[in-house]
Amino acid sequence: MKKIKAILCVFILALLMTSSTKTTTIFVIGDSTAAEKGGFRNNPERGWGMVLQGFFDDKVIVDNHAVNGRSSLSFINEGRWKKVLDRIKPGDYV
């Protein structure tokens, strides 16, 4: 019984160690409401995708693909959706 408990403890520790090093990516897609805006000092406008990273630690990466003036159709037709699909991995979010 002690061996089973020891093996179980080792397994749980190994699982915790591997999961703690994994990062999760949140891919932001959309229009101007989420898009990156230039000129931070002179432009008070911010898309929500710009500030999202501030709500997470270093285990979560926010990858913002939002672009001003885009619709779902133009996002797909311009190949922007494919770029996200090519990079997404299990455990990521869009």
Map each language-model feature to its residues.
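Charged, often glycine-rich, active-site loop that binds/positions anionic groups
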Residues: 72-84, 88
